[in-house]
Curated annotation (Swiss-Prot):
This is Tetraacyldisaccharide 4'-kinase. Transfers the gamma-phosphate of ATP to the 4'-position of a tetraacyldisaccharide 1-phosphate intermediate (termed DS-1-P) to form tetraacyldisaccharide 1,4'-bis-phosphate (lipid IVA). Belongs to the LpxK family. The keyword Transferase applies. GO terms for molecular function: ATP binding; tetraacyldisaccharide 4'-kinase activity. The lineage of its organism: Bacteria, Pseudomonadati, Pseudomonadota, Betaproteobacteria, Burkholderiales. It comes from the Bacteria. It catalyses: a lipid A disaccharide + ATP = a lipid IVA + ADP + H(+). ATP binds at I67, A68, G69, G70, A71, G72, K73, T74. InterPro entries: LpxK, P-loop_NTPase. Pathway: Glycolipid biosynthesis; lipid IV(A) biosynthesis; lipid IV(A) from (3R)-3-hydroxytetradecanoyl-[acyl-carrier-protein] and UDP-N-acetyl-alpha-D-glucosamine: step 6/6.
Length: 338
């Protein structure tokens, strides 16, 4: 089991290898060559029309990444949806619904469970109020959403840069602070596909990853408050010195713990769990003094059994120029008659 608040030793070693072209990465490089051939072949099949991409009747924005692991794309999706709403658009969100126990196409409602629809789509639905549908085939989710909510005039796809079966009008690629790593494809590097590649906008938490698309720096920090299951806010400063058990089932749990520390909180214990962890069998620490504090994504799964858990929202700082560029691209789509 991983040390509290840290990834497993194997995950740490692989992640370290992805940042450098060392011995482990070199040993895995032949597999990356094979992966690259398969990736290129798949793209060629779509480019030549042997495999078809389905185009939906409204503009589609895909927010995703080209690296394995967490890049923070879902918070960006939520920020894009809120921006579109503020600009008068009526957005809907489609997603695969990774980690859910179901396999059908279905709507994500505020009362849905994460087991039915996935933790990230449920978080988006509750936080934005936008209609959300999940399906393995994103185009199917889009068709179902537009049929159920015909006023929707734009779709945002949470993840799916590599899901070429869905035609898209704009692509937003998100990078965490590790960027493109050593620049190699899986498994010798973190890349799901070669980078740079053509996208419309890039958001990066670290150094600019290169490529020809407009690039914008983003920063992440925790909000200054926690939220309980009833939606009540509690200033984090009131939790300083209190006995806390912090837990995170995200791709990079140590980032959450570090951000808690930056807000002045020092949990007595920290528990790192796999991304999209199913909390149905999770055992609460026996120490009754400890208050649970977690991410928003984990809270949608924890609250049914542990309504006293506190969730700390993530606050993104995205430059206004990013949204200005997004608006300009959407305006050009409208003028071209999409």
């Amino acid at each position: 089991m991983a040390a509290p608040g840290r990834p497993s030793p194997l995950a740490e070693r692989l992640r370290g290898a992805w940042q450098h072209r060392g011995a482990l990465a070199l040993a895995l490089w032949p597999l990356s060559l094979l992966y690259g051939v398969l990736t290129a072949l798949r793209r060629a099949l779509y480019r030549t029309g042997l495999l078809r991409s389905e185009r939906l009747p409204v503009p589609v924005i895909v927010v995703g990444n080209v690296i394995a692991g967490g890049a923070g794309k879902t918070p960006v999706t939520l920020a894009v949806v809120r921006h579109l709403q503020a600009r008068g658009w009526r957005p809907g969100v489609i997603s695969r619904g990774y980690g859910r126990a179901t396999a059908d196409c279905r709507e994500v409602l505020p009362a849905s469970s994460a087991a039915e629809v996935g933790d990230e789509p449920l978080l988006i639905a509750r936080a934005s109020g936008a209609p959300v549908f999940v399906a393995r085939r994103r185009a199917q989710a889009g068709r179902a959403l537009l049929a159920a909510h015909p006023a929707t005039n734009i779709l945002v796809c949470d993840d799916g840069l590599q899901h070429l079966a869905l035609a898209r009008d704009l692509e937003v690629c998100v990078f965490n602070d590790e960027g493109a790593g050593n620049g190699w494809l899986l498994p010798a590097g973190p890349l799901r596909e070669p980078w740079p590649r053509a996208v419309d906008l890039v958001l990066h938490a670290g150094s600019p990853p290169g490529g020809g698309a407009p690039q914008f720096a983003l920063s992440r920090e925790l909000a200054a408050h926690a939220v309980n299951a009833s939606g009540q806010h509690l200033p984090l400063e009131q939790l300083q010195g209190e006995p806390l058990h912090a837990l995170a089932a995200i791709a990079r749990p140590h980032d959450f713990f570090a951000m808690l520390h930056a807000r002045g909180l020092q949990p007595e214990s920290e528990e790192a769990l796999p991304d999209h962890y199913d909390f149905s069998s999770w055992k609460r620490p026996p120490d009754k003094r400890l208050r649970l504090i977690c991410t928003e994504k984990d809270a949608v799964k924890l609250w049914p059994a542990h309504p006293d858990a506190l969730a700390v929202p993530l606050a993104l700082r995205i430059p206004p120029a990013f949204f200005d560029t997004l608006d300009a691209r959407l305006a050009s789509l409208s003028s071209s008659g999409h």
